[in-house]
Amino acid sequence: MLRRNVLQLIGGGVVVAAGSVGGFIALNGPSEAAREPWKKAGQYGDFRRRALSYALLAPNPHNRQPWLVRLEGEEALTLYCDLARRLPATDPFDRQITIGCGAFLELLAKAAAQDGYQTIIKAFPEGETMETLDRRPVAHVVFKKGGTAPDPLFAQVLARRSNKEVYEPRDVPAQALTAIAQAGRAFAVSASTIGNTDLAARLRDLTWRAHLKEVTTPVTNQESVDLMRIGAAEVAANPDSIELEGPFFEAGRLVGAVNRKALADPSSAMFREGLAIYQNMAMSARSFGWLINDNRSRADQINAGRAYACLNLKATALGLGIHPWSQSLQEYAQMAGLFREAHDLIGAGRRIQMLFRIGYGPKIGPTPRRGLEAHLV
């Protein structure tokens, strides 16, 4: 109802004082400036900068892009976490942030291999705590010429997406699901995928209930709302986090329907519209996948991120969408019951690091990125 009303406002001239609806839509698309790093990837003279320009396109929680890099000498670098970009409400132990660092490192390694460099990665070289990340390095990377070959999956880096759309009502072939799982079985990570089975139906229900839990828990929902960038101007100013762009959001912003107060209020029309959108996404999932390891160290979380990057690229190569839906794996108190349910269902006595849906989604554009210079210290 809200979406229809906003579109009526556009067509009725409330938003568009002059010109056509088509003109309004054409002028209110996603921010191109916020996507510029995707076009600049690989356009650097130094091989490390070249590799980093691809690494910063990695999937990461809430698109926080928490990577800080210090270049060292001619053939090394150190990766740190930008602690201001943590997610203390939904990711209190920084597990998901660390997984995002692992995905960054895997794209770094694949990009360096294109230039003939092997990457020797040591996770947490100065020690770690499993409570929260701190100012100590996440990883130290040394590049060594030779001893590696280009990875065919690298060709998918610029096309890789997290496809957060409704998927088509058709099953994913078993052969494709097997190939995706095989791509994720790396770095001592177990990867599983399933088609449209009874277990998939249970996971649809579980992931939807976990989403509801997150958005109806005030502190976790507010964390997301505070990180929303509403409209192209906000996205261009802060090309990170959760972007709400396009004609619907621009029109809703102009008429006062889309704002942070409404997005944080479970009784608002905007909140209900958001629930409907996400429920449609959840119920469209016919296939799922998940990653498991022992989670005994931060290195296990890094490895989960590296494995996820591999299978995300494989899914892209197969023309499939993939969308992390891991709310039930989060460690805050209100999610404890669903956390146990998820692990009882598919955990096999170990730690589920990632849970995601797989399917045929529409073609979508890239998400905002901050650019290489924002990550260098």
Residue locations for each model-derived region?
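Acidic, surface-exposed loops and disordered segments
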Residues: M1-V377
